[in-house]
Every structure is written in structure tokens, then in C-alpha cells.
């Protein structure tokens, strides 16, 4: 059986799988997928012919990984943890950090099965299993990258940003942030929403699948997708009865030179000398 076939078959009988009952073939397949996600060999979602495609079997492997492992003690800097998923950097040496070429500030936490690309900076933040963080991206203080979320190249996730995962509540597709995006402080993008390349999301914007994304220039309303190059702020739209207003996200304009100047990436913070 192929790796995918083993995972698909195991997922159908997931309720029966425990750390004591899992067979060797299934355990090996799940662990191979987690290692592949950890190294960047596999991605839960990727862009193919201009469209984002989710590889559901990889997401299923992530979910199955919680069925095959018992909780265990995990050593931290000043404390201990008790969890089923190991920490990504538990066995990293100085040489391996230098080779992979990203910076990790104290208190940043990355779970095994997440991939961090070269020239990334992880401030005290959290990156969950199955996530992919693209080259040159900054994950700022208290930002959270949810399970299986896909973060593009040269992205800035500002302080306190939340990028939703797929594990709980269970989501069909991961949340995706395209290349060269800026996500403002304390904003939340969840429920498999796709923010296309080159967008700027202002501070305190919340976007889920049911959030209306209103383009003030065209009057068009989008759901679940922010078009490429959009500048988005929080706002509201009137109800049909006109008695109250409901929250929405507003596309106020397309990214221009002035906007880029305000949110430009500081290469001095990214590049690690080889």
C-alpha cells in the first residue's frame, strides 16, 4: 500500500486506534508524514496552477498522530510540559540552527511537524503541528500559527495575530496567508480563509468564512477570500431592516507605494549570515 493509502485506511478506523493497539505499519506511516511535514517535504496545502489545493490525507495523518502517542514529560527552559506532541527544536544543535538559517527568540514554541523556512524570525510565538512558515517571514510576539496553516514568503504576522488551525473546531481546509502579506496586530484570520498575495490587513480585523469582505470601490462582497493586493480594515454594513449594523471587513483600496512604505520588511532582521 502507498503511504497515502495507509493513512486513508487508518483514518477510517481512527476510533479503534490507541497507542497500545496501533500496528507498526500505521505508526510508521504517520511518523513518516510528520517527519515530512517537519522537514518541508510535504505541505498540507500548496498552490497548483494558481489554485490552492489541500492534501486531505496529510491533514488526516496529523489528526491520527494524536491517537498513537501517550502524553510524556517535555522539558522547557524553566519548567516541564506534558503532551502528546514533541517540540520541534528539542534535539537541535547550534550547528543545525545555523544550517537551517532561522532565528528563534526565547519562549517561542514550535511543535514537531511544523516547517520553518530560511531567514524566518520567531519572536515569542506559537507554531502548531502541520503548519508551514515561508522564507523570510516574521512571526511577532504572541502571534499564533494554527495547525496546518500555510504562511507564505516575506509575511509579517504582527503582535498577537491569530491564524486559525484545522484541529479544533475541525476545519475542512487550512487557513492560508499568501506571499508578501502584512497582518496587523491582534487580527484573526480563521476557518480556512485565504488571504491572497500582497494583502495588507489592518490592526484588529477579524475574518472567518461568514465574515462579509466588502469592496467599497466595486460594491462586491467576498466570503472566505481576500483578493490579492487588498488593503483591509474593520468596518460595518447596515442590516436589511436598517435598524442596526453588523461587523464586516472593508477593502478600502489596493496596495500602493505609500502602503508598502509603511509595512515594508526590514531585511536586516531576517538575513542570517552563512
Swiss-Prot record:
GO terms for molecular function: 2,3,4,5-tetrahydropyridine-2,6-dicarboxylate N-succinyltransferase activity; nucleotidyltransferase activity. GO terms for cellular component: cytoplasm. Pfam families: Hexapep_2, THDPS_N_2. It is found in: Cytoplasm. InterPro entries: DapD_Trfase_Hexpep_rpt_fam (IPR005664), Hexapep (IPR001451), Hexapep_transf_CS (IPR018357), THP_succinylTrfase_dom1 (IPR023180), THP_succinylTrfase_N_sf (IPR037133), Trimer_LpxA-like_sf (IPR011004). It catalyses: (S)-2,3,4,5-tetrahydrodipicolinate + succinyl-CoA + H2O = (S)-2-succinylamino-6-oxoheptanedioate + CoA. Pathway: Amino-acid biosynthesis; L-lysine biosynthesis via DAP pathway; LL-2,6-diaminopimelate from (S)-tetrahydrodipicolinate (succinylase route): step 1/3. The keyword Transferase applies. It comes from the Bacteria. Its EC number is 2.3.1.117. GO terms for biological process: diaminopimelate biosynthetic process; lysine biosynthetic process via diaminopimelate. Gene3D superfamilies: Hexapeptide repeat proteins (2.160.10.10), Tetrahydrodipicolinate-N-succinyltransferase, N-terminal domain (1.10.166.10). Substrate binds at residues 103, 140. Keywords: Acyltransferase, Amino-acid biosynthesis, Cytoplasm, Diaminopimelate biosynthesis, Lysine biosynthesis, Repeat, Transferase. It is an enzyme of class 2 (transferase). Belongs to the transferase hexapeptide repeat family. Homotrimer. This is 2,3,4,5-tetrahydropyridine-2,6-dicarboxylate N-succinyltransferase. It comes from Actinobacillus pleuropneumoniae serotype 5b (strain L20).
